Regions:
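Acidic catalytic motifs of isoprenoid enzymes
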Residues: 116
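Conserved recognition-core residues within compact binding domains
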Residues: 2-110, 119-142
Length: 142
């Protein structure tokens, strides 16, 4: 089905269907969670492999192709109950999730995403904001 790219109707369709999107940052791993088409997706980064928990059934997916803004999230679907999975059914870039929250421009050089409430473990997509060189840029429309 291809990669969802910024500035396309694909992102709009995905976010019209995805709900409860949240980012969680822990000491040794990161997760992105969302509901999509009746199933809860939970992607876990442990540095090398990314695990997708699809309706309680774990499956290994491809590692992100690079770090931070250019990461790729591979969503897979369960084909049957014999642990056979269809890979590459949908790919969503983590950067695209951020774009959908902040707008259609890339992050300014030297910027990164922070959680406004200071707690990544309970940070929803609406609590994300841009931080540049250690100075919060609240109100930035990106």
């Amino acid at each position: 089905m291809g990669t969802i790219r910024k500035s396309t109707a694909s992102i709009d369709r995905f976010f019209a269907e995805a709900h409860d999107i949240s980012f969680h940052n822990y000491v040794s791993y990161r997760t992105v969670e969302f509901l999509w088409r009746g199933a809860r997706y939970r992607l876990v980064s442990t540095g090398d492999l990314y695990v997708l928990d699809y309706s309680g059934l774990p499956a290994l997916v491809h590692p992100f192709e690079s770090v931070y803004k250019n990461e790729h999230i591979s969503c897979v679907s369960v084909a049957d109950q014999r642990n056979y999975y269809v890979r590459r059914r949908k790919q969503i870039r983590l950067k695209d999730l951020v774009w959908a929250a902040f707008g259609d421009r890339d992050l300014p050089k030297g910027s990164h995403i922070i959680c406004k409430n200071g707690n990544w473990q309970s940070c929803g997509i609406n609590n994300l904001e841009v931080d540049q060189y250690g100075v919060s840029s609240k109100g930035s429309s990106l």
